[in-house]
Structure formats: structure tokens, C-alpha cells
Amino acid sequence: MILTLTLNPSVDISYPLEQFHLDTVNRVKKTSKTAGGKGLNVTRVLSEFGENVLASGFLGGALGQFIEEQLMDAQIEQSFFKIKGETRNCIAILHEGQQTEILEQGPTIGKEEAESYKTHLLELFKRANVIAMSGSLPKGLNTSYYADIVKLANKQGLPTILDSSGQSLMDVLLSENKPSVIKPNIDELSQLLDTTVTTDIDSLKEAVTQPIFKGIEWIIVSLGGDGAFAKHHQTFYKVNIPKIEVVNPVGSGDSTVAGIASGLVHQQSDEDLLKKANAFGMLNAMEHQTGHINVDKFKELFKQIEVIEV
């Protein structure tokens, strides 16, 4: 079973407008509301592919209940931890080919809630084979919270995938307990190392072999339309992908994480894991809906992806 963690979920609200006018009333004809957050995108894709997945994280208030109901409607198993605060809204205003986002900070997690959730996780770990952690940390949690979870998972011998950024990712990298997989894009890699990393293979090899990444089994670097670069133990791979018509790239990274988790839980070969991860990301980009893949197109796309050792 794959356990997904979304510690700062949201209700994602989309407001499509032909034109967005400031300092006046804008009337929206059609509104969509979905259970949001990077980890929930991962969850949906895994569920669509038929994987056994369990969603967890913090939920509170009426908005938290909305997320629970959406997941129930999708027949996705969940075990969230209830908090006193209210789950946040994230608003996207789609206008004139652009997207303006208004993101609420979200609830503040109390110290007792933070510690109690770790106990809750230990129970969930008994059922898990792989853990995928995605997104930002809510207010109130120390930036080392992901590092704490990785430590707990490592003690249980559970592989972990971490898709985060900023200080929470840095705290994990600087800790003694390393995740099994990280998935930075090239900009995030450059930011972590405070240098410019290019798509040149030698530049990428030098970057992912820096001491800060020591002990991490898999480093998978997204290169956008150029595919991906990966390091597994001491072996390097370049992933070449076919050209596709990109409809909506948002959520493609989350779908890639879903592919990695699926590859790990089925103990697939390096080549097949990388093919699956990239196929999931591309399938998401080919759809309008974020965190969604057309499973019927998977096999054909999988065949077109090339993984070479470099």
C-alpha cells in the first residue's frame, strides 16, 4: 500500500473569467471546487491507475470535511488527523490566458497536534509499503517536520519519497536520516546548491554527487520537455521523452511522484520505474484536469520513452 501525506491540503477554487478587472465587481459564471494539495494530486493519479493508496494529513473545519467527502466520492481511502483550525482555500483566477493565484496561509498546527500526528502515522506505517510526502508545511510545524517523519519511516524500513522545497527540504538533506527519493527540477537543484546547474550531463552529474545528497538512493531531476536525469546509487540515467501536446502542465510533477511510488511498490527495474514516472507526468500534462491521467494511453506512451545509462 502507498501512503500519501498532504500536510497542508486545500480546497482549490477555479474562477474562469474572460477579463479580470481590478477595483470592481467580477462575476463568475462557472466555479469549480476540488480537493487540492500536491499529495492529493499524487493520490488521485495512483487511484486512477488502480493502486492501493491511503491519503493522510491534517484536516479541519467545513473545508476539511469537503475534502473528506470528495475523496469518499472518488472511493479513495483516507485517514486524516483532525485539527482545531480550518483547512485553507486556494483560489485560481483564470483570465486572458493567464492565471492569478490567491493562496491562503492555512491553519496553524498546535504542538500537541503535531506530536499526536506522529503517533497517528506510526499506526498507518504498519500498513504501508511506500510513503510519498508532498507540498508545503502548514504554519506551526517546525521546518524539520519532514525530517522527523523520514526518521520514523527509516526506523520501520519504509522507503520515502519527498517532493518539497525550501527550508523543509534543506532540513531533510542536512539531517542524518535521508529519504529514499527526491525529485527536484533543475531550478530547485540550482537553488539548493546555490549555483547554476544546466541540462548538460556533466553539470547534472556534478550536481547530484554533491555531499548534501549523500545517502539518498534516488535523485530524479525533471528537465521539462527534455525528459529527466536520474541517479540511482552510483548509476546515472538520461530519460528521453517523445513530443506531446501540452494541455495543462500543472500537477505533472505530482503525477511523476505517483509513478515513482508505483514503481517502488512493485519493485520495478530502474528503467521501468523511470519510464512509468515520466509517462505519468506526461499523461497529466495532456489533460485539462490537474492530477488526472488517461490510463488508456499509458502503455503506448510507456513504449515511446527511452532510458539510457550515461
Swiss-Prot record:
This is Tagatose-6-phosphate kinase. It comes from the Bacteria. InterPro entries: Carboh/pur_kinase_PfkB_CS (IPR002173), LacC (IPR005926), PfkB_dom (IPR011611), Ribokinase-like (IPR029056), Tagatose/fructose_Pkinase (IPR017583). Its EC number is 2.7.1.144. It catalyses: D-tagatofuranose 6-phosphate + ATP = D-tagatofuranose 1,6-bisphosphate + ADP + H(+). The gene is lacC. GO terms for biological process: D-tagatose 6-phosphate catabolic process; lactose catabolic process via tagatose-6-phosphate. It comes from Staphylococcus haemolyticus (strain JCSC1435). GO terms for molecular function: ATP binding; phosphofructokinase activity; tagatose-6-phosphate kinase activity. Pathway: Carbohydrate metabolism; D-tagatose 6-phosphate degradation; D-glyceraldehyde 3-phosphate and glycerone phosphate from D-tagatose 6-phosphate: step 1/2. Belongs to the carbohydrate kinase PfkB family. LacC subfamily. Pfam families: PfkB.
